[in-house]
Swiss-Prot record:
The protein's name: Carboxy-S-adenosyl-L-methionine synthase
Uppermost EC category: transferase
Purpose of the protein: Catalyzes the conversion of S-adenosyl-L-methionine (SAM) to carboxy-S-adenosyl-L-methionine (Cx-SAM).
Species for this entry: Desulfotalea psychrophila (strain LSv54 / DSM 12343)
Keywords recorded for this protein, A-Z: S-adenosyl-L-methionine, Transferase
GO MF entries: carboxyl- or carbamoyltransferase activity; S-adenosyl-L-methionine binding
Annotated Pfam families: Methyltransf_25
Catalytic activity: prephenate + S-adenosyl-L-methionine = carboxy-S-adenosyl-L-methionine + 3-phenylpyruvate + H2O
SUPFAM superfamilies with a match to the protein in the record: S-adenosyl-L-methionine-dependent methyltransferases
Similarity comment: family membership: Belongs to the class I-like SAM-binding methyltransferase superfamily. Cx-SAM synthase family.
Complex and partners: Homodimer.
EC code: 2.1.3.-
Gene Ontology BP terms: tRNA wobble uridine modification
């Protein structure tokens, strides 16, 4: 399957709030590859952690599963026929592309993609929940409730893998991180106009927490073991384990 190049913000004009519509879906995989530092490496690291924590016949849920890339790559690395993979997203175009990709890779029997509001997540006895670069799009006042739902959904010993764009409350350092990320995107072919217009479109949509704010949120809802497992400047990944009784 050939993915189209992300050219959404190439033309000057007033930027509308970013949304996961059909236009974004067409270029989403390219957008991720060029906009999220070490995206593939984070999935690889996630797979290594899951390999050590998943039990027989566990289910893995990906909230905000988009085009299914994360789950498909996890299944390729894990090579576990007993694991069920469930992608949840509110975007019909995203789900349609995810289902098509799963069929193309002959993964249809092991995968399901559900159209649901992840803020109402209520599945039970999950072995793992993945939340990569998704929580940042949920309104801050709703995040604690979402985390409580995820915590309740996990079996004892189940894991949450969370990746987020983060903010530093040290203003000078935060400016440095933003500048480095700006150059990262330029190196991957985005123009100054594209970078500026996307930043404006995301301004009131993507609201990052700091590393400590994310960790404290996880601990507040009941997770006892919370650790960072990947960081690139203002992008961070966390693992949280639900305690055994």
């Amino acid at each position: 399957m050939t993915d189209k190049k992300d050219t959404i913000f190439q033309n000057p004009g007033p930027a509308e709030d970013f949304e996961f519509n059909s236009r974004v879906v067409e270029v989403f995989d390219d957008m991720l590859d060029r906009s999220v530092p070490f995206y593939k490496e984070v999935i690889q690291a996630s797979a290594q952690l899951l390999q050590r924590h998943l039990k027989e016949n566990d289910s893995v849920y990906d909230l905000g599963s988009s085009t299914g890339t994360t789950l498909l790559e996890l299944s390729r690395v894990l090579k576990r026929q007993d694991i069920s993979y469930v992608g949840i997203d509110a975007s019909k175009p995203m789900l349609e592309k995810a289902r098509l990709k799963a069929e193309l890779y002959s993964k249809g029997d092991q995968f399901s993609f559900l159209e649901e509001d992840i803020t109402q997540f209520c599945h039970q006895e999950a072995g793992a929940v993945i939340l990569h670069y998704t929580l940042q799009f949920i309104r801050p006042m709703q995040r604690e409730e979402v985390m409580r739902r995820i915590y309740a959904s996990l079996r004892p010993g189940g894991v949450l893998l969370l990746s987020e764009k983060t903010i530093s409350h040290q203003k000078e350092l935060n400016r440095d991180f933003i500048s480095i990320y700006h150059h990262f995107k330029k190196d991957r072919g985005y123009s100054e106009l594209e970078i500026a217009q996307k930043r404006e479109a995301l301004e009131n949509v993507l609201i990052p927490f700091s590393q400590n704010e994310n960790k404290n949120l996880l601990k507040k809802v009941g997770f006892e073991c919370v650790e960072s497992y990947f960081q690139w400047f203002n992008f961070s990944s966390f693992m949280a384990i639900k305690p055994q009784p």
